[in-house]
Amino acid sequence: MMVLVTGGFDPLHAGHIKYFEAARELGSKLIVGLNSDDWLKRKKGKVFMPFNERKIILENLSMVKRVISFNDDDDTACDAIYQLIKM
């Protein structure tokens, strides 16, 4: 079973790792939906680490099966869920 977590992860910290570990226990594949730089600017007013750098870091975590970008203009994870269903 796939498990989806979403967020900006900017910057990635120990709390995120614990979140990923807990989510990974719920299924066999952990998929991370990564929010865009535009989303971060709207939410936090700035970007600490650009999307591509955050994506590379997440992709190199052994517990993460795949990282997807998604459109979060409506402040939901619906687009990420839709992409997950299509996988």
Indicate residue ranges for each PLM-predicted region.
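Nucleotidyltransferase catalytic core that binds NTPs
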Residues: 1-87
